[in-house]
Amino acid sequence: MWWLWASLCCLLALGDARSRPSFHPLSDELVNYVNKQNTTWQAGHNFYNVDVSYLKRLCGTFLGGPKPPQRVMFTEDLKLPESFDAREQWPQCPTIKEIRDQGSCGSCWAFGAVEAISDRICIHTNAHVSVEVSAEDLLTCCGIMCGDGCNGGYPAGAWNFWTRKGLVSGGLYDSHVGCRPYSIPPCEHHVNGSRPPCTGEGDTPKCSKICEPGYSPTYKQDKHYGYNSYSVSNSEKDIMAEIYKNGPVEGAFSVYSDFLLYKSGVYQHVTGEMMGGHAIRILGWGVENGTPYWLVANSWNTDWGDNGFFKILRGQDHCGIESEVVAGIPRTDQYWEKI
């Protein structure tokens, strides 16, 4: 009997796979198919004339890796608003509004971490300290604790590195902001742009424990440390409470090719091939036309999606968005002299 049951399961799975048409990840056909499904989001072109290898490299997070211990949350008596946007809650913290660009490198795991860490330093010092924490420092110096640099990494390892080794400051490519700005240039998503083409190639830059010329203090003096790092349970309310009390978090989820085409609305996977795991920064939540969503910042520049941001279905662990949330608290004692 068992073989009948197994055969039936295989046939159902095969039937489901065949019921979803196959499209090239960036095709007009995929855009049109999504927009005809009467779903909760709209598709359009964000990338033109780029290699599929580049698109897959953008998704550089290893899902299901080791996690730090969960922090115990007491949310029973906490009244959470129907909608929340960290940009509005902490308007004096400019990094919350920022969208970065990881370039041709699978460094999303590092960007999601340093973006949320930057936000939390500002929030937990009551905006007395505002710093862009360096994705370059984390990407290049974390080593095997975090994974494999531009070839992918673990968000949990990134937060652990912050607490153990610290991270220096560093802004966007060619910004000359901070100790170690990002060294990988943005690449051109569009046909007639001025930036270099997007490819799936490129090595991880070398770890350098020296700040760029003209910057002071020294590399060692510029380090910012975390007090602790932890996982957040996949409970919708626990994640909301964590953001509400402590600021944006890093999350990760499975990316399918239809997500690459996101323009507006609340993303729900419709069709398309699996591209890989992707880490992002979750900064709020809300409800749009009756559909609950997470408000999320991506790291694919502002010409992707909704000015670099997107919304994704909340409360159903859609594409695993609620299963890989990590966060941490800054060590505020290091800033007492500045405060």
UniProtKB/Swiss-Prot annotation:
User: Signal sequence span per UniProt?
Assistant: 1-17
Q: Which UniProt keywords apply?
A: Acetylation, Cell membrane, Disulfide bond, Glycoprotein, Hydrolase, Lysosome, Membrane, Protease, Secreted, Signal, Thiol protease, Zymogen
- UniProt-listed SMART domains: Pept_C1
Q: Name one Pfam family in it.
A: Propeptide_C1
Residues with attached carbohydrate: N192
User: What GO molecular function annotations does the UniProt record carry, in alphabetical order?
Assistant: cysteine-type endopeptidase activity; endopeptidase activity
The protein's superkingdom reads: Eukaryota
Q: How does it sit in the membrane?
A: Peripheral membrane protein
Listed SUPFAM superfamilies: Cysteine proteinases
Question: What residues sit in the active site?
Answer: C108, H278, N298
Give the location in the cell.
Answer: Lysosome; Melanosome; Secreted, Extracellular space; Apical cell membrane
Q: List the disulfide bonds.
A: C93-C122, C105-C150, C141-C207, C142-C146, C179-C211, C187-C198
Q: Which reaction does it catalyse?
A: Hydrolysis of proteins with broad specificity for peptide bonds. Preferentially cleaves -Arg-Arg-|-Xaa bonds in small molecule substrates (thus differing from cathepsin L). In addition to being an endopeptidase, shows peptidyl-dipeptidase activity, liberating C-terminal dipeptides
Q: Which GO terms describe its biological process?
A: proteolysis
Where does this protein chiefly localize? Answer: other
Residues bearing the modification N6-acetyllysine: K220
List its EC numbers.
Answer: 3.4.22.1
Q: Subunit arrangement?
A: Dimer of a heavy chain and a light chain cross-linked by a disulfide bond. Interacts with SRPX2. Directly interacts with SHKBP1.
Similarity field: Belongs to the peptidase C1 family.
Query: Per its database record, what is this protein's job?
Result: Thiol protease which is believed to participate in intracellular degradation and turnover of proteins. Cleaves matrix extracellular phosphoglycoprotein MEPE. Involved in the solubilization of cross-linked TG/thyroglobulin in the thyroid follicle lumen. Has also been implicated in tumor invasion and metastasis.
Protein name per its UniProtKB record: Cathepsin B
Q: Which organism is it from?
A: Macaca fascicularis
